[in-house]
Design a protein with these regions (language model features):
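A short, hydrophobic secondary-structure junction motif
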Residues: 53-62, 104, 108, 169-171
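Acyl-donor-binding surface of acyltransferase catalytic domains
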Residues: 129
């Protein structure tokens, strides 16, 4: 039970869940995603609290945020799933069904304009950057998170900007279309591809 004051900003902690439950979408006023959505994936209220009565809230999970395809090398490629529009943040898992997720596919998140943040494991080997984040006008950050299993990751991030790493140095792979303000390019950057800033 939690007390919320009418007209104020609010948040509810996301529930603990197993992977089998799917990804937490948010808290709703009805079961199974029915009723009114109250929070985002982090449990932060979508707008100030507007009820003076007691309200029961229910967690909603989706198993269709992402779609996985098994590749010939026995690793998975990931792209958007049918429920992607329900999310404002997405975290790509390092594994799926016990196998490595190695690839962010072509057009993976094309035109997913509800998404503002994408978190990707440092174990990812291939990101089809020319199309994976195309037409994502509200995307402000692509973050690479540590899995603790990779010594020399293929990709890294800085303040939401995606870099590709090699022995010679870094290359800016993707600059989010929704990112604003000043940005200082990392000093060990050796390549800035043509049109990397064209959507900004």
């Amino acid at each position: 039970e939690k007390e919320v004051v009418f007209g104020t900003e609010f948040s509810f902690d996301p529930p603990a869940s197993d992977a089998k439950d799917g990804m937490f979408v948010g808290w709703y006023t009805g079961t199974n995603g029915t009723g009114v959505p109250l929070t985002d994936v982090d449990g932060v209220g979508l707008k100030p609290w507007n009820s003076v009565a007691d309200v029961y809230i229910y967690p909603y999970y989706s198993s269709n945020a992402l779609s996985f395809t098994l590749k010939a090398d026995d690793t998975y490629q990931v792209i958007k799933g049918l429920d992607i529009a329900k999310f404002n943040k997405i975290t790509v898992p390092a594994t799926y069904n016990g196998k490595k997720v190695s690839t962010i596919g072509a057009n993976a998140f094309n035109s997913c304009n509800t998404i503002t943040v994408i978190n990707i494991p440092d174990s990812i080997e291939i990101i089809e950057v020319s199309t994976a984040f195309r037409n994502m006008k509200n995307l402000i950050a692509v973050n690479i998170y540590e899995t603790g299993t990779i010594n020399a990751p293929r990709y890294s991030s800085d303040d939401g900007v995606l870099y590709a790493n090699d022995v010679a140095g870094k290359e800016i792979s993707y600059f989010p279309a929704g990112k604003s303000g000043e940005y200082a390019i990392l000093p060990d950057t050796i390549r800035i591809p043509a049109k990397v800033f064209y959507q900004v």
